[in-house]
Amino acid sequence: MMENYKHTTVLLDEAVNGLNIRPDGIYIDGTFGRGGHSRLILSRLGAEGRLLAIDRDPQAIAVAKTIDDPRFSIVHGPFSQLADYVDERNLTGKIDGILLDLGVSSPQLDDAERGFSFMRDGPLDMRMDPTRGQSAAEWLQTAEEADIAWVIKTFGEERFGKRIARAIVERNRIEPMTRTKELAEVIAAAMPVKDKHKHPATRTFQAVRIWVNSELEEIEQALKSSLSVLAPGGRLSIISFHSLEDRIVKRFMREQSRGPQVPAGIPMTEAQLKKLGGRELRALGKLMPGEEEVAENPRARSSVLRIAERTNA
């Protein structure tokens, strides 16, 4: 059914420009999706260039397999394991750029059968790879109320997390929920105050999705791995869509741009300081979509692109 869903790639040119493509370079698109970024990268590569794409969504893999290009290869798996994929190809330390477009994609949101949307009724799944791990329904049916409340508060930043968790557990005791519409209705009924600008299920659906897919852990691991796989001068170009994602990316780039921090008052020789190493990255700034892009694609409104460059440290 995926062919019915139109996907507009957010910050397409800006993210690829951020990679500073060399015609003979080796690049990674860690979130292939429907291939918008990958196709643009390929258009800028010469005959000797290479692109390794990664995605854990089987539908994205099916799209990627339609690209008949000897410079292109696709891996079915999470981008957190990019260091393994690179090592298997003997490319560690040779990657010239990594692009990550974080979060859920429009085709995933718009396909009711994937279970990501509270606006369309479908199976309560939410897995980016439906062949692995627990579905949202399975987790909500087996998790403790306190754990559900913590997830909703932590990953959804929802102040009524405890109320919602209690309502979910009580409903599942009566009859286990298996549909997105059922969960959305339970959440709405549990909310004592409604936000007129936001659907009551927005934050909880985000939280459950992040938890089911281990999204924030995936980002943290991929960022750590990037330091070992990037060549000196290699670029990181990362698009995030909500504050939890962007906070992780921003903190990582800031910390790696500062280098090791020595507490004040601790004497160290120049030789000792050198052993600590220098800055791993040079932060090159951030970009946000313009008014025209947001008008054409409202989902771009919250996106932030951050770019950094690997140093010689």
From Swiss-Prot:
The protein's annotated catalytic reaction(s) are: cytidine(1402) in 16S rRNA + S-adenosyl-L-methionine = N(4)-methylcytidine(1402) in 16S rRNA + S-adenosyl-L-homocysteine + H(+)
EC number(s) given by UniProt: 2.1.1.199
Binding, S-adenosyl-L-methionine: 35-37, 55, 79, 101, 108
- Keywords of the record: Cytoplasm, Methyltransferase, rRNA processing, S-adenosyl-L-methionine, Transferase
GO BP term (any one)? rRNA base methylation
Q: Name one GO cellular component term.
A: cytoplasm
GO molecular function terms listed in the Swiss-Prot or TrEMBL record? rRNA (cytosine-N4-)-methyltransferase activity
Its localization reads: Cytoplasm
Q: Which Gene3D superfamilies match?
A: Putative methyltransferase TM0872, insert domain, Vaccinia Virus protein VP39
N-terminal signal peptide:
none
**What cystine linkages occur within this chain?**
none
Explain the purpose of this protein: Specifically methylates the N4 position of cytidine in position 1402 (C1402) of 16S rRNA.
| NCBIfam families referenced in this protein's UniProt entry, alphabetically | 16S rRNA (cytosine(1402)-N(4))-methyltransferase RsmH
- Return the similarity comment: Belongs to the methyltransferase superfamily. RsmH family.
Protein name as it appears in the record: Ribosomal RNA small subunit methyltransferase H
Protein species of origin: Klebsiella pneumoniae (strain 342)
User: Mind giving the lineage of the organism this protein is from?
Assistant: Bacteria, Pseudomonadati, Pseudomonadota, Gammaproteobacteria, Enterobacterales
